[in-house]
Regions:
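A cross-domain feature marking catalytic cores of carbohydrate-active enzymes
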Residues: 49, 142-144, 173-175, 202-206, ...
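Shared catalytic-loop signature of beta/alpha-barrel
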Residues: 218, 224, 235-346, 350
């Protein structure tokens, strides 16, 4: 299965709302930036990363795929994903460019495409190729009802709809107002509306400092918060560890960590209770597995950050024994041949060969962007 071509692409896909905001970002579209790898026997593998649809930076990722990685891949055996991952990740000329950010996002897209090829060649879904499903039910939690930009009225209506009409028993709400008391009041209202049995997680997107987080957690301690995601700046190991010691609310993080070494540092410091790897930020499926195995060794649950990558994470979550639940944000799923759909709060287990990353032709035609 020799690699014949490596062709990058950019899609800018509309959200389910006109725009959304959390504590640090405001966007109207989601970027799906990736590559199609074709082999000499006619198979095509699709892989991608997720962005905020900023075209100039998206083009940096596709340039890295086209100009840096493609020449290293042409003629190689696509089956040898581990060797190829190491070849790209450790390529000497790229070491000073960066071992995170653009180079790793590009690596993720390539690696996912290689796994997609491998599963298609075997004629099975990725979860089956990896060793089979650990369960027949993967529960979803809904984040798309909880954006910080939503009014309290819309927040309550969306949360109630998700639970009472759509079958979700878990939701996640964004926090991070300049005055944290606003967030406490919103959480109190949602908890009162939904009752005690719904699991409510929160996500700060790294907005607050440690004293603010500690005061917030004290005020919110009776609201039965399932986890507090990214309460502090993403690289602050000591701060997260201090918050973990001072609060009864478990900490979740990982979407902004790019290497297994970064995860190891947080885990070793006791700074995380729920591990949230993302194949689009890590170097694809290959490095994701390393992180999930690390979490398993420390008896920590894995709950992938899946806002833009549930297409692949649904396979990994059905398979890996450390996995528990999976995030649901339905922005991009309908642009793929096999969408990562949820029925009654449960993810459908994929059935088609591959990693569920094959993009619909009409989505390329309608939402594709120029690479230059």
């Amino acid at each position: 299965m020799k690699i014949k071509s490596v062709e990058p692409f950019i899609l800018h896909l509309p959200l389910t709302s006109d725009s959304i905001s959390d504590s640090t970002h405001s966007i109207t579209h989601w970027g799906v930036v990736g590559t199609v790898i074709e082999t000499t026997d006619g198979l095509k593998g699709y892989g991608f990363t997720g962005t905020h649809a900023h075209l100039a930076s998206d083009r940096l990722i596709t340039a890295c795929i086209r100009d840096c990685y493609a020449p290293l891949l042409i003629g190689e055996d696509a089956n040898e994903h581990q060797r190829l991952w190491t070849k790209l990740a450790r390529y000497p000329s790229l070491q000073w460019v960066g071992r995170a950010g653009i180079t790793h996002l590009a690596l993720a897209a390539v690696d996912v495409a290689l796994w997609d090829l491998k599963a298609k060649k075997a004629g099975v879904p990725l979860w089956s190729l990896l060793g089979g499903a650990r369960t027949d039910r993967l529960e979803a939690y809904n984040t798309d009802i909880g954006w910080l930009s939503f009014s309290l009225e819309d927040l309550l209506a969306g949360s109630a709809r998700a639970v009472e009409e759509e079958g979700f028993t878990r939701i996640k709400l964004k926090v991070g107002h300049d005055d944290p008391n606003n967030d406490v009041r919103r959480l109190e209202a949602v908890r009162k509306r939904l009752g005690p049995d719904v699991r409510i997680a929160i996500d700060g997107n790294g907005k607050w400092d440690l004293p603010t987080c500690q005061r917030f957690c004290e005020r919110a301690r009776d609201l039965d918060i399932y986890w507090f995601e990214e309460p502090l700046w993403y690289d602050d190991i000591a701060g997260h560890a201090a918050l973990a010691r001072s609060s009864t609310i478990p900490i979740a993080l990982g979407e902004q960590l790019y290497t297994v070494d970064a995860f190891r540092a947080f885990i070793s410091a006791g700074a995380v209770s729920y591990v949230q790897p993302d194949v689009t930020r890590l170097g694809g499926v290959t490095e994701y597995i390393q992180v999930a195995d690390l979490a398993l060794a420390h008896r920590l649950p894995v709950v992938p950050h899946a806002g833009e990558m549930s297409q692949v994470h649904v396979h990994l979550s059905y398979w890996h024994p450390a996995s528990t639940i999976l995030e649901y944000i339905p922005w991009i799923k309908d642009h793929f041949e096999e969408p990562s759909n949820v029925d009654g709060g449960i993810y459908r287990r994929p059935q088609q060969p591959g990693a569920s990353t094959t993009v619909l032709k009409e989505s390329f035609e309608r939402y594709g962007k120029s690479l230059s």
